Amino acid sequence: MQHVISLHNGTPVSRFLPDPSESVVPGVAWGRFEEALTPAFWAAQAWMQELGGGEAFGLGDTLAEEVAACLLGGYGAPAEVGLAAYGRVRQAMRSTAVVDVGAIEAMLTMPLKVGDRLVRYRFARQRSRQLGECLARIADIDEAALDDISLRDTLTRLPGIGPKTASWVVRNRRASDEVAILDIHIVRACVHMGIFGGGATPARDYVGLESRFIGFCRAAGLRASLLDALMWRTMRSIGPSFAGLRPASNPSSTGGRSRGKTACPEVVAQAGTI
């Protein structure tokens, strides 16, 4: 067993994780929690995140606002730019009964202030058309009558909304553990652990990869919604340097330490067999 110790409100708290050589899912060992990007590392980090109050999901107060946030923050839009665009559009949505395509395009065409810079939104015309149609059709969705998967599937029928964006909306609206937001950061983390194969492509098999991710979360006793958000932040901070990391090796087959970046600065901990 591995003994993980952390400080919570100044008090040491601990939990135990399986031995590094044990499998969390077939073919994937837990690894050592103090070595970054192993399954045990993610389990320890998720546990500490929950100690600190968990995650706050949701960017909007209504389904329409959440769709706007996730669509504008989708493919090709850096997170900060997407949020800036959404902030501008949301203000109009809250002050005007109907926001038409022309108004949205005008808002997205104007430079956005991101930090101390002025930047332009890359897909102003395309996204304004998509969002305008989404807002026109979203009133027809009976959100309360749909379970998480059904809501996700319904949202994918809207223009510009694929399974990843739809899953993002559902996760944010419901803190759902039934869907996963499989962007490049989550895919890289899962490939590194061996949960996904090296050629994993959500565009070709979103549901299959999502099933593997959620299966891993359940086997590890983790909330998929929390782990998804945690992986996104961590892998995004690593950036392109992650490409140079080798996938974690299986301690049960090599007899050695898994290949991962060492150090988990938030943890005051020790690992051993007890």
Regions found by a protein language model. Name each.
Residues 68-71, 113-120, 150-151, 166-172:
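Short, flexible active-site loops
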Residues 86-159:
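Alpha-helical ds-nucleic-acid-binding substructure associated with the helix-hairpin-helix region
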Residues 75-80, 93-97, 139, 177, ...:
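Short alpha-helix boundary/capping elements
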Residues 68-76, 86-90, 131-139, 214, ...:
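Short, amphipathic alpha-helical segments that act as regulatory/interfacial helices
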Residues 48-87:
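DNA-contacting interfaces and partner/effector-binding or oligomerization modules
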Residues 75-79, 125, 159, 177, ...:
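Residues at alpha-helix boundaries and short interhelical turns
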Residues 1-55, 61, 127-136, 146-152, ...:
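C-terminal accessory module of base-excision DNA glycosylases/AP lyases that mediates lesion recognition
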